[in-house]
Amino acid sequence: MTLPNDLLETLVKRKESPQANKVWPVTTFSLARNLSVSKFLPCLSKEQKLEILQFITSHFNHIEGFGEFIVLPLKDTPLWQKEFLLEHFLLPYDLVGNPEGEALVVSRSGDFLAAINFQDHLVLHGIDFQGNVEKTLDQLVQLDSYLHSKLSFAFSSEFGFLTTNPKNCGTGLKSQCFLHIPALLYSKEFTNLIDEEVEIITSSLLLGVTGFPGNIVVLSNRCSLGLTEELLLSSLRITASKLSVAEVAAKKRLSEENSGDLKNLILRSLGLLTHSCQLELKETLDALSWIQLGIDLGLIKVTENHPLWNPLFWQIRRAHLALQKQAEDSRDLQKDTISHLRASVLKELTKGLSPESF
């Protein structure tokens, strides 16, 4: 099973529209669920996983208000398409292992994804690109309610929805706000703005990578037990909004300071993308972030509507590169191939950038 080309085009275009908030461009929501009639995933045999897969996917047909869903059993899906979906939805899952009994179910709108038999029997995932977080969460809850009526999720009056990881019990909701805050991180103001007592944690964009590649900080709720969806969203919104305002103020201060060290960092980043023949993902994200800061501070000239940070944030990921820059019958995700391809793409896109006189 493969994704149809028109759906792939839809997923790419969903990310090309200008974002309402450049500092806070993306928010995701995940609801973890398990069937009441089955044991948790680590206790299941391959045959039991296949039964659960068939049972859950049979209820993704003709859900009112959601359009068509496409089911992709992982064992039959090309690696680049599996990675493409995880990249698009910013899902931090590792695809290593036996995919038997696992599947992804994607909506044609490009807003919703279901992961079956990954960590729980079912994880419902939604992504918002335009700042309509309440609408996205409401739709995800509607989808959850419909499936609950058909599948009967495991629920305890004391602990709420039951999940493989006890930390996810309760509402089973994990919300993530992705913030691009290079000015706050450069000026080292970020740590002073996070209240450690608040039930919010920070993490990296890239799975298993420390620090904040691309100067992107991911805010998420620490747990969901004893908290409503509305309370979780409100807490994250307050923190994300505070950081967004602080980032704008930090950029203004950096512009007034006119630091030679910052100019050097920005121009070295431009040189890296202009003259490299191989580029790794982390260093590319970092360089793009500093260049975008340079554009915002007026240190780099840019052609009109130059698509630097968005949608390049996605386009430099390896499955997106494979889709858009390789022939359909020969898509290759090997490290050297992707590193060369990434450098070639960035070299072309940075032709329209030049430093202001210093």
Swiss-Prot record:
Pfam families: ATP-gua_Ptrans. GO terms for cellular component: extracellular space. GO terms for biological process: phosphocreatine biosynthetic process. Gene3D superfamilies: Glutamine synthetase/guanido kinase, catalytic domain. ATP binds at residues 26-30, 174-178, 203-208. It comes from the Bacteria. Keywords: ATP-binding, Kinase, Nucleotide-binding, Transferase. Residues 23-250 form the Phosphagen kinase C-terminal domain. One of its GO terms (molecular function) is protein kinase activity. Signal peptide: none annotated. The keyword Nucleotide-binding applies. It catalyses: L-arginyl-[protein] + ATP = N(omega)-phospho-L-arginyl-[protein] + ADP + H(+). Its EC number is 2.7.14.1. Transmembrane segments: none annotated. Belongs to the ATP:guanido phosphotransferase family. Catalyzes the specific phosphorylation of arginine residues in proteins. PANTHER family: ARGININE KINASE 1-RELATED (PTHR11547:SF38), ARGININE OR CREATINE KINASE (PTHR11547). This is Protein-arginine kinase. It comes from Chlamydia pneumoniae.
